[in-house]
Amino acid sequence: MRAGFSDFQLIRDQVLFLQDQAQRLTEWLQLSGFENPVSESTTLCLREREKRIPTCVAVCVPSPGTVHTALLHPTTLSQSRSSSEAKMLIIHTA
């Protein structure tokens, strides 16, 4: 029974950490000119130093307290496909 309680505490701590990070991201987006975060979205691109290949994070705040991010990395493309692989993370801050 102690292991179950410990697991619960670990999961709770991880959720609280993600909620804190999502809240900080929401505040940063609002300070960066997102006057209406319900309909705004942006893409942040970082270039890898050696490969000069962009890794983009698409950020969307569809409603107050919710942040959607998608990590796009062009190196995951196959030769025959033209779309990037995306990993979606949805965070609820409320």
From Swiss-Prot:
One biological-process term from Gene Ontology? wound healing
Q: What induces it?
A: By lipopolysaccharides (LPS). Down-regulated by cytokines IL1B; TNF and IL23. Up-regulated in tears from patients suffering from different forms of dry eye disease (DED).
A single GO cellular-component term from the record reads: extracellular region
Which tissues express it? Found in lung alveolar cells type I and II, as well as alveolar macrophages (at protein level). Detected also in testis and kidney. Expressed by different tissues of the ocular system like cornea, conjuctiva, lacrimal gland, eyelid and efferent tear ducts (at protein level). From these tissues is secreted into the tear film (at protein level).
Subcellular localization, as worded in the UniProt entry: Cytoplasm; Secreted
Keyword check for Plastid, yes or no.
no
Keywords of this entry: Cytoplasm, Secreted
Q: What does this protein do?
A: Putative surfactant protein. May be involved in wound healing and in the reduction of the surface tension at the ocular surface.
The protein in question is named: Surfactant-associated protein 3
User: Which species is this record about?
Assistant: Homo sapiens
